[in-house]
């Protein structure tokens, strides 16, 4: 498998620290508000990555944190704690806000068929681990206390900002506009490991520490939680491209300083979902959620398909017109699968293996989900049995998770119910899109037969046959297909 590594800025052959096993970490949500669909694009693509690794035979352990303290509005060390901001907005406690939006996040994930990670760890569960890691960094000379806070000393590193290759003088003090420089820092790119009351005295969540009552910085959370559950060596760290700097840059700095060796082999970043005004984000005010899509009549799975049609390393522009096109594509795909007939015949293993190889080749190519979607249509066109096609589609859908077989089964039931309505002549398109002109001719043929005008009925049948259309008479109606 070739996978693009943000750390080295190139595609590399995937390898693991322990043969056959993958230690995978995902930056989880900051649970102060609903996730917007741009956030969820990252989790969809990470879900495909995890499922494809499992499909390929790896034993995957995936860990995700829940940030319920310490993530400031600047994404660096300035601004207001996002959790406190959410609590004030809704006049609730921070922990009430955290529980509500954690539950909401996983409800959205379930609707999008995003698998829950093996381990989900809220930051507030791991305060002892954070304190121990900060103490270790101080002991090793990589951290210092100033103004009551503990800072990581970036000047002690030979390399920093490995993701974006910025020169030192080009780096900004703050990530977002409107943040002030912290004068306690020895170097402008140092970052906070532990805050005390010298900052943000109204912070709702505080714990005792060797440096006074306070709370952890955002970056220390992911490092300590991943080391706790995955050990000192990690294979893949996932996240949105927003997190590459400063969050992931600072994670690498503190983790490798603490451990004394390379920490993570591959960094997997999903690019932005943009709307007509640019990058989608909560800081803009209103934003698109799964709930909003549902209220507009969209199945969340169609949004998943919309995401899979584009490569994860490309910015994806969201429009409702684009989502409408995904609806049409999805419905056509389901109609084609619904037309396949299940049977007890043996699987055509030669055909199945050829199709499997094409699907795996697509995803081995830097998780190219667009090519993997094309592989679905290759299955439908392949000269083999319907039973084999259904088997292979089910295997592929373990990775893509588009409800292909269950949606097709539902479609078949709907067609059966339509056919048995008393007194109705039902026309069903089999394996193709409905066509009003074809349906009108088939109904005219039925009327001619009822009037015993068999010559006219035969004429219409021959006309349709000349168009490449075969009619199959069934109880209560007719089916037609293109041949």
Each language-model region and where it sits:
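Short, well-structured beta-strand/strand-turn elements
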Residues: 59-61, 141-147, 383, 470-472
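Structural preference for alpha-helix termini/caps and helix-kink/transition segments
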Residues: 279-282, 287-483
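Short, glycine/charge-rich beta-strand/loop segments that flank catalytic centers
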Residues: 63-69, 98-105, 115-130, 148-157
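Non-catalytic interaction-recognition regions
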Residues: 57, 92-95, 106-132, 142, ...
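N-terminal, positively charged nucleic-acid-binding surface of large information/translation enzymes
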Residues: 8-11, 17-113, 473-480
């Amino acid at each position: 498998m070739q996978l693009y590594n943000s750390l080295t800025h190139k595609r590399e052959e995937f390898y693991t620290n322990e043969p056959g096993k993958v230690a995978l970490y995902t930056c989880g949500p900051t649970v102060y508000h609903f996730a917007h669909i741009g956030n969820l694009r990252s989790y969809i693509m990470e879900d495909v990555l995890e499922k494809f690794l499992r499909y390929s035979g790896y034993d995957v352990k995936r860990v995700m944190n829940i940030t319920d303290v310490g993530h400031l509005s600047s994404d660096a060390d300035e601004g207001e704690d996002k959790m406190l901001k959410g609590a004030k907005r809704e006049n609730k406690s921070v922990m009430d806000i955290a529980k509500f939006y954690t539950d909401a996040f996983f409800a959205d994930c379930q609707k999008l068929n995003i698998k829950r990670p093996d381990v989900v760890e809220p930051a507030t569960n791991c305060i002892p681990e954070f304190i121990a890691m900060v103490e270790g960094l101080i002991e090793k000379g990589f951290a210092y206390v100033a103004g009551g806070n503990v800072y990581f000393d970036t000047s002690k590193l030979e390399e920093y900002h490995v993701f974006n290759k910025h020169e030192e003088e080009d780096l900004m003090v703050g990530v977002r506009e409107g943040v002030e420089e912290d004068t306690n820092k020895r170097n402008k790119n140092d970052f906070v490991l532990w805050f005390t009351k010298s900052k943000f005295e109204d912070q709702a969540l505080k714990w005792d520490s060797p440096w006074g009552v306070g709370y952890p910085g955002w970056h220390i959370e992911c490092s300590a939680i991943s080391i706790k559950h995955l050990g000192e060596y990690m294979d893949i760290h996932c996240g949105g491209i927003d997190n590459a700097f400063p969050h992931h840059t600072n994670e690498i700095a503190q983790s490798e300083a603490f451990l004394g060796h390379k920490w993570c082999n591959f960094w997997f970043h999903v690019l932005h979902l943009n709307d007509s005004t640019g990058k989608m984000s909560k800081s803009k005010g209103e934003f698109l959620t799964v709930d909003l899509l549902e209220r507009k009549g969209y199945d969340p799975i169609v949004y998943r398909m919309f995401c899979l049609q584009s490569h994860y390393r490309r910015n994806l522009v969201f429009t409702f017109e684009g989502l409408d096109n995904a609806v049409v594509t999805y419905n056509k795909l389901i109609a084609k699968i619904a037309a396949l007939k299940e049977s007890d015949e043996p699987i055509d293993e030669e055909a199945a293996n050829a199709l499997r190889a094409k699907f795996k080749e697509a995803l081995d190519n830097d998780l190219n989900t667009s090519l993997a979607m094309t592989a679905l249509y290759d299955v439908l066109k392949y000269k083999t049995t319907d039973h084999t096609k259904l088997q292979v589609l089910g295997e592929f859908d373990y990775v893509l998770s588009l409800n292909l077989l269950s949606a097709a089964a539902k479609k078949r039931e709907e067609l059966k119910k339509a056919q048995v309505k008393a007194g109705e002549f039902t026309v069903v398109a089999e394996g193709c899109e409905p066509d009003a002109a074809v349906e009108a001719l088939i109904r005219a043929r039925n009327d001619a037969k009822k009037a015993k005008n068999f010559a006219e009925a035969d004429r219409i049948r021959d006309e349709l046959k000349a168009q490449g259309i075969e009619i199959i008479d069934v109880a209560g109606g007719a089916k037609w297909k293109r041949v």
